[in-house]
Regions:
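Short, well-ordered coil/turn elements that cap or connect secondary structure elements
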Residues: 53-55, 131, 148-149
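Conserved P-loop
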Residues: 2-94
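Loop/turn-to-beta-strand initiation segments
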Residues: 33, 100-103, 131-139
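Short, polar loop motifs at secondary-structure junctions
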Residues: 140-144
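Conserved beta-strand termini and adjacent loop/short-helix elements that scaffold enzyme active sites
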Residues: 61-63, 139, 157
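Phosphate-binding/switch loop-helix module in NTP-utilizing enzymes
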Residues: 72-129
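A short helix-turn-beta junction within AAA+ P-loop NTPase domains corresponding to the substrate/partner-engaging
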Residues: 148-160
């Protein structure tokens, strides 16, 4: 695990996602292969269709089954969606283990830590799967203290 290649964008969620997408496009323009995995934001078909046009350089995945954001779901729906989130987390780990991309963006991931859907041990397992050549970017509202030891750069984005 090489912390100087781990970045966090935190703050206003729409802004952090936009910044991460901009970075993904810039990286792809420099020849990097990019995978974006989105968490907690629901299944957004229109956005996914647009992002599919960036393939094969930028690939986008969402394991959500509901159209709604996670916070808008009933408790029963949230339990169901948590299984899908776990699938997304396991896929992220697989991407890191196999070195499938040079940049992995985990959009909304910080919310998984905030909501205790992912433990500090899960995070450690994920970060230990990362090779030195792979850059990882996390986005979300705020950074959990358990993540700080893995991160070189933290960018806080807020509207004025």
């Amino acid at each position: 695990m090489c912390e100087e290649k781990v970045t966090v964008y935190c703050g206003d969620e729409e802004s952090t996602t936009a910044a991460a997408l901009g970075y993904a496009i810039q990286s792809a323009g420099h020849g990097d292969s990019v995978i974006i995995i989105q968490f907690l934001k629901g299944k957004r078909e229109e956005a996914m269709e647009l992002l599919r046009r960036l393939e094969p350089e930028v690939r986008f995945f969402s394991f959500a089954r509901s159209q709604k954001n996670f916070a808008e779901l009933s408790q029963e729906e949230q339990q169901e969606e948590e299984m899908n989130i776990r699938n997304g987390f396991n896929f992220a780990r697989k991407v890191l283990v196999t070195g499938e991309c040079s940049l992995l963006i985990l959009d909304g991931f910080l919310g998984l830590l905030d909501n205790q859907m992912i433990s500090a041990e899960d995070l450690e397992s994920l970060m230990n799967a990362k090779s030195e050549d792979t850059k990882v970017m996390f986005t979300g509202k705020g950074i959990d203290n358990s993540m700080r030891k893995y991160v070189a750069d933290i960018f806080k984005i807020h509207k004025e």
